[in-house]
């Protein structure tokens, strides 16, 4: 024990020399291109592990450190399980931050972007993420965005890309349009934080709504493999609603306005119609009744203030389809023009928003429901809600005043952006303004250099000011290029496929490679992309499936969302001055310590408070790993002579690693490694370091540690005299003879009531558990003469006999 305490003291006093390890191994790994996949290997099973690629806004931050630690953990795990692992790297390098930085500093967004990419690449290499650097890509490279344009043209050819004049979300700060998904619930821009206003512009859209049902239905394929909250968020965003479209005739227009409702049974409670401020019907009615100026002013002010519920009496009436009574029509700020019909039959007696509006504008409030039955509803009074819903729907349809319909919250994807740093839209316009798609042979439509371009946001596309670029003479005719650029979420909607053929110049990727590697087995990134990026990627994948470019319907089989790295409970922010700098932490503590400490801090989905991350403990553990490896003789011995107790601990860990990785309990593996090291070091004092079980334990620790701290693991592997590299080493086979058969208490029930308990092995089968339960005297007596309808068995915890009534 004295020697053990001496070694512990040595480790505690000895500085963990992370810098020497990093300087030793990083250049060797880079020289050997250790993590490039072997495309010629057709025998080894394959896995595709992908981290959400980075935006190059500066150096890496601690959020990147966490994401890459988890993604690399999983990639290395599958290599240790004998898989050929594709783990590529790239940059989402188009976008507003680069353009805004260029405006602020008077620089070129391209120079700013690629300088940051170079900085991040250096940090990533040092961080020892096991990327295949030969597949590196940047979405701002012409070799990449050429295929953005190709994909856009495919969508256009199939009627899924179209241009129309529409009310759009306008960011007055960045002076560009936003997709609905980029507007936060409080009406502000996701990126700039500015209050978003409505503006009518001619824009390009992608018809994602054509895939609404498939996007919704196929979420069932992802259950248990994606976080439930992400599936719920997507399901809610798509927002499928079954209901009825009902026509309310407007005499002054001599035509009806159509409303959509999921509650037709409330039609007798309608006391006013509410129309969206920005609908054409609203403007037409306002014009006829002389309140158009008031409407436009109110709409403008609402865009600026977003205050409460606002409305305007349009001094018009609609005819109730069942009662024939006149119903007043109002413009209301809470009605969205791009959802359902942009018109609502308002029932203030049974809807809180309608009630607030009715109270504010002194409109009637009528109750038409009591104890789940209709009242004051004509011939439908007394019917249950369910009966009335069906009967009213049937009668409206029979009179051609209504029709059954399905509505979606999901809107088509607006991809036009009035900014410079993005993919040019590959469309020309002739002298008549007709759209002409650019020929595929003429791709890419290159983004011109920014020199001489005024990038200051003006509401107009900067590309429009480059006349030599905009105007194109072809075949004796003059054409104009489209001057908008694409939403950068288009770039990231398919990037995972370009990694399969990053150098291919005849296609974005080949079906052969898509079949070989796709879909992505494990995707790692933040939950902030739950609706935007992930929904768009699913849409594009389904389109590519439809046109025969991939043979799978979902892009990402499994998804892990990590929590945030915060400081003192608050989100890190430069403006708050509470940033933890990645480069400073790496310089002070080393890569391995940071990676181990981050993963050890808790389950991936939980936030990590940096103040609680134990660097000292991680450094001490890694130092002990190396020092203990030095104690182990390099010679091999017969494992059958190894200490049985230690081998039980080692094989228990090996047995549990698979399910711990599968359930993302990486922190538990870290704790188990620390336990195994402590047990091994104590065993050295009693059985000696030359016992074969010692070497087996330390080699197992080295292989598992590679998933956390690769520099330390590689050093241990070399010290142990093993063949380079530890990243290629396979986990030892589990010897089940060393696994203890543990017991647990099983509950035995009859019709859900406790009738007995059993002490059983944890690996008991269903048949064994049912047989043992039946053999209990109390159960045997209770079941005597009774018929068992079914048996519910959840080994090793529960047996429930469901019996026929006496």
UniProtKB/Swiss-Prot annotation:
It is found in: Cytoplasm. It comes from the Bacteria. Its EC number is 6.1.1.4. One of its GO terms (molecular function) is leucine-tRNA ligase activity. Its main location: cytoplasm. A motif ('HIGH' region) lies at residues 54-64. It catalyses: tRNA(Leu) + L-leucine + ATP = L-leucyl-tRNA(Leu) + AMP + diphosphate. Keywords: Aminoacyl-tRNA synthetase, ATP-binding, Cytoplasm, Ligase, Nucleotide-binding, Protein biosynthesis. CDD domains: LeuRS_core. InterPro entries: aa-tRNA-synth_I_CS, aa-tRNA-synth_Ia, Leu-tRNA-ligase, Leu_tRNA-synth_edit, M/V/L/I-tRNA-synth_anticd-bd, Methionyl/Leucyl_tRNA_Synth, Rossmann-like_a/b/a_fold, tRNAsynth_Ia_anticodon-bd. It holds the Pfam family tRNA-synt_1. GO terms for biological process: leucyl-tRNA aminoacylation. A motif ('KMSKS' region) lies at residues 571-575. It is an enzyme of class 6 (ligase). GO terms for cellular component: cytoplasm. ATP binds at residue 574. Belongs to the class-I aminoacyl-tRNA synthetase family. This is Leucine--tRNA ligase. It comes from Tropheryma whipplei (strain Twist).
């Amino acid at each position: 024990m004295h020697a053990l305490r001496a070694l512990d003291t040595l480790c505690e006093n000895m500085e963990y020399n992370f810098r020497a390890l990093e300087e030793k191994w990083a250049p060797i790994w880079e020289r050997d291109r250790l993590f490039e996949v072997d495309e010629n290997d057709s025998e080894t099973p394959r896995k595709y592990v992908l981290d959400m690629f980075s935006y190059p806004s500066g150096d890496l931050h601690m959020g990147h450190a966490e994401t890459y630690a988890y993604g690399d953990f999983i990639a290395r795990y599958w290599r240790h399980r004998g898989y050929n692992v594709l783990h590529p790297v790239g940059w989402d390098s188009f976008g507003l931050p680069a353009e805004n930085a260029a405006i602020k500093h008077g620089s070129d967004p391209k120079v700013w972007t690629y300088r940051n990419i170079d900085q991040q690449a250096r940090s990533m290499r040092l961080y020892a993420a096991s990327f295949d650097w030969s597949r590196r890509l940047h979405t701002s490279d012409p070799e990449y965005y050429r295929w953005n344009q190709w994909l856009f043209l495919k969508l256009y050819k199939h009627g899924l890309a179209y241009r129309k004049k529409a009310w759009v979300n306008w960011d007055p700060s960045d002076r560009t349009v936003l997709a609905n998904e980029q507007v936060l619930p409080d009406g502000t821009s996701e990126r700039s934080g500015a209050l978003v206003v409505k503006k009518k512009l001619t824009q390009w859209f992608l018809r994602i709504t054509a895939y609404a049902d498939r996007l919704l239905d196929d979420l069932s394929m992802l259950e248990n493999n994606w976080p439930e909250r992400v599936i719920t968020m997507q399901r809610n965003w798509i927002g499928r609603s079954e209901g009825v479209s009902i026509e309310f005739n407007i005499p002054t227009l001599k035509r009806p306005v159509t409303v959509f409702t999921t509650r037709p049974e409330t039609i007798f409670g309608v006391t006013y119609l509410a129309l969206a401020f920005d609908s054409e019907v609203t403007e037409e009615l306002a014009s006829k009744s002389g309140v158009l100026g008031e409407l436009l002013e109110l709409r403008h002010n609402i865009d600026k203030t977003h205050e409460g519920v606002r409305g305007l009496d349009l001094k018009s009436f609609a005819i109730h389809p069942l009662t024939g009574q006149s119903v007043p029509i109002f413009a209301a700020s809470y009605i969205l023009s791009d959802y359902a019909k942009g018109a609502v039959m308002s029932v203030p007696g049974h809807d809180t928003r309608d009630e607030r509006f009715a109270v504010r504008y002194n409109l009637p409030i009528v109750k038409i429901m009591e104890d789940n039955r209709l009242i004051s509803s004509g011939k439908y009074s007394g019917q249950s809600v369910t009966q009335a819903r069906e009967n009213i729907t049937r009668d409206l349809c029979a009179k051609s005043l209504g029709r059954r319909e399905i509505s979606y919250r999901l809107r088509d994807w607006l991809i036009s952006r009035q900014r410079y740093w993005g993919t040019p839209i590959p469309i020309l316009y002739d002298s008549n303004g007709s759209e002409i798609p650019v020929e595929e042979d003429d791709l890419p439509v290159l983004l011109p250099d920014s020199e001489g371009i005024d990038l200051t946001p003006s509401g107009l596309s900067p590309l429009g000011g480059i006349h030599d670029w905009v105007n194109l003479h072809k075949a004796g005719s003059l054409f104009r290029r489209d001057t908008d650029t694409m939403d950068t979420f288009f770039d990231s909607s398919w990037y995972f496929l370009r990694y399969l053929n990053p150098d291919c110049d005849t296609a974005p990727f080949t079906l052969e490679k898509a079949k070989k590697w796709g879909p992505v087995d494990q995707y790692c990134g933040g939950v902030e992309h739950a609706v935007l990026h992930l929904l768009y990627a699913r849409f594009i994948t389904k389109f590519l499936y439809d046109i025969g470019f991939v043979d799978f319907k979902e892009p990402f089989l499994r998804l892990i969302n990590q929590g945030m790295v915060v400081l003192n409970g608050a989100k890190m922010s430069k403006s708050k001055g509470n940033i933890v700098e990645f480069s400073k932490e790496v310089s002070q503590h080393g890569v391995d310590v940071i990676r181990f400490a981050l993963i050890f801090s808790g389950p991936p989905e939980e936030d990590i408070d940096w103040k609680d991350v134990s660097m000292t403990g991680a450094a001490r553990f890694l130092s002990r790993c190396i020092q203990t490896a030095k104690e182990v003789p390099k010679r091999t011995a017969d494992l059958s002579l190894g200490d049985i107790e230690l081998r039980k601990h080692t094989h228990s860990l090996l047995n549990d690693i698979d399910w711990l990785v599968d359930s993302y309990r990486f922190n538990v593996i870290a704790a188990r490694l620390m336990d195994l090291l402590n047990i091994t070091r104590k065993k050295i004092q009693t059985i000696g370091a030359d016992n074969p079980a010692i070497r087996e334990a330390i080699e197992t620790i080295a292989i598992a540690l590679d998933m956390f701290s690769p520099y330390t693991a590689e050093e241990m592997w070399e010290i142990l005299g093993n063949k380079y590299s530890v990243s290629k080493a396979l986990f030892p086979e589990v010897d089940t003879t060393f696994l203890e058969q543990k017991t647990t208490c099983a509950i035995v029930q009859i019709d859900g009531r406790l009738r007995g308990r059993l002490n059983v092995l944890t690996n008991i089968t269903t048949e064994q558990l049912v047989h043992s339960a039946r053999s209990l005297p109390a159960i045997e007596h209770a079941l005597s003469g009774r018929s068992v309808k079914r048996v519910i068995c959840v080994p090793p915890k529960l047996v429930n006999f469901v019996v026929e009534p006496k």
